[in-house]
Structure formats: C-alpha cells, structure tokens
C-alpha cells in the first residue's frame, strides 16, 4: 500500500478552491467587460441578456411604453474625472422607468472602475475640497453617498481566456436600488474522486 503525501493533496485541494473562487469573481465582472456588445460569451463566461436585445450599455434602449429611447452609456466614451462624474450622475438621475415615470430612489451609487482609474476615483470622492480647482470649493462627492469599487478584472489585460479583454478607461455607475445585476451560480464547484 502506498502512503499518500496528504500535505500535497490538501495543498492541491486548496489551490482548486482558490481557482474556483477566482473564477466566480472573474465571471461577476464580465457583464461590464462585455456590456457594450451583444456577444453571448465574454472571456469564456456565458451571459444571458433580457429586454430589448441591445447591448447592456447602449445609447438607444427602447422603452416598453413606446416613449423616446434612452441611453445608459456615453456615446463618446468619456474618461473618468470630476466633471464627467457629474455628467454621468445627471444622466443616471434623469433616466425614466419603462412607463415613462421618473426613477424614485436610486439609493447608494457605486462608481465601478478598473484598478488603473482607482486613484482618480478615490481622489474625486474622498477629498474634502474639490480636487480640480484652486478656490477651495467644497467637494459634494465626499459625503459617503458614492462608493468606489476598483478591480483588475475590468482592466485591459492580455493572457486571459479569449485574449485581451476589458478596458483601462471604461467606468460605470451602479445604483443599488435600481434593477440589480444578477449572478446565478448554476453549478457550484465540487470535488470528485
């Protein structure tokens, strides 16, 4: 009977668990990486899309009441800065529901950025005074209402499944009380012998 090296076996199990956990984190950000197209799989992750058949982030979303189309994306791909944050927030707050009525409560808003933009985002929402002016204006974004979520899983990185993916400049506003992005773990990772 052969003795097993149990330390190595458990180390392999731990590494498999870490790999499975990372894959779940990676998969959770793929709607952002692939949100500007209607491709069904992004970086090896299958995405299910519902609604109007357009990309998740589109400038021409239709409303079910037949009203004017709406945009939840910049048509020019504006970079993150204080001024463009204000532009994005105004656009988000002026969105209408499918019946044409205003959105009543957005809740806390998260600014989701690739790690390359994290410093700028944290300066904009964390400074006590406005970071882009010299007149000591108050910074209206540092009241805790805006949360920064930064991750390397959004950045443009080569060597991922499917090649280079993500963007070093794309940023997103996510309102917690609006329609939530849903992550369904259809088949949890399991270990079998």
Where are the regions that the model predicts?
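Sequence/fold signature of self-assembling virion shell proteins
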Residues: 51-98, 105-110, 115-193
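Catalytic micro-motifs at enzyme active sites that drive phosphoryl/nucleotidyl and oxygen chemistry
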Residues: 3, 97-100
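Glycine-rich, mobile lid/loop segments that gate access to catalytic sites or pores
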Residues: 24-66
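Long, contiguous amphipathic alpha-helices that act as assembly "spine/axial" helices in icosahedral shell
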Residues: 1-40, 111
